[in-house]
């Protein structure tokens, strides 16, 4: 059996929205919503809150999960998801890592379970949560999913264009470490079998000012 570990990354510092991860939403710290959803899901062997700040450890304890103290040098604005996920995987025993962003407070335990199941059942190396955008989309001012020489299509007839939701990401430890060593980056999967998992409705709401 593969060991599946959940990680919720939550820096205390943020330049655009200071202490956003512990700001209250309906009288509850923002980060607590996804922690509770992760606990309610029944797919994880361990759940960690990953932060540089001990201030968040009390929230982890309250939710009955583990706290991982991120090194200070990985808590700056210059550090990326690639960096702190690698640090976590190098120090925590896991076969599969599922990352849940605290800035997605409406993610549900049911979606988390389905996401983790999809990752394992399909033997993905990387699984990315996405939104389907069923609207006319452009890239470099050129149409992606419609013909500009034809009449305006009905939205329901358009081929959906996928964009990152970021709320949920998953990687196998082996593929993540291998990609990082080869490319100095691993967040997007690089090599290996990559899948997408579509989120809908409020689960795609993201309160990020940064992805950490």
Regions found by a protein language model. Give the residues of each.
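Short phosphate-binding loop-to-helix
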Residues: 48, 54-98, 107-114
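Conserved core of the sugar-phosphate nucleotidyltransferase
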Residues: 84, 105-188, 197-198
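Short, high-confidence coil segments that cap the C-terminus of an alpha-helix
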Residues: 44, 94, 123-124
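Hydrophobic helical membrane-anchoring modules
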Residues: 189-191, 195-212
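A short, N-terminal amphipathic alpha-helix
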Residues: 30-47
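Active-site acidic Asp-centered loop
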Residues: 100-102
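N-terminal nucleotide-binding beta1-loop-alpha1 segment
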Residues: 1-18
């Amino acid at each position: 059996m593969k060991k599946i570990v959940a990680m919720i990354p939550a820096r205390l510092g943020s330049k655009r929205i200071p202490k956003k991860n512990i700001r209250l939403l309906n009288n509850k710290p923002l980060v607590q919503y996804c922690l509770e959803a992760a606990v309610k899901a029944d797919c994880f062997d361990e759940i960690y809150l990953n932060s540089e700040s001990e201030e968040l450890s009390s929230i982890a304890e309250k939710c009955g999960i583990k706290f991982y103290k991120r090194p200070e040098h990985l808590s700056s604005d210059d550090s990326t998801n690639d960096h702190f996920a690698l640090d976590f995987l190098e120090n925590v025993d896991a076969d599969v890592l599922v990352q849940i962003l605290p800035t997605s407070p409406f993610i549900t335990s049911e979606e988390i379970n389905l996401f983790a199941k999809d990752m394992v059942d399909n033997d993905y190396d990387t699984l990315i949560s996405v939104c389907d955008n069923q609207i006319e989309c452009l890239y470099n001012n050129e149409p992606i999913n419609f013909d500009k020489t034809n009449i305006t299509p009905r939205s329901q007839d358009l081929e959906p264009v996928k964009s990152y939701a970021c709320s949920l990401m998953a990687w196998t430890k082996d593929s993540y470490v291998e990609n990082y060593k080869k490319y100095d980056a691993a967040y997007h999967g690089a090599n290996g079998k990559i899948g997408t998992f579509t989120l809908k409705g409020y689960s795609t709401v993201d309160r990020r000012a940064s992805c950490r």
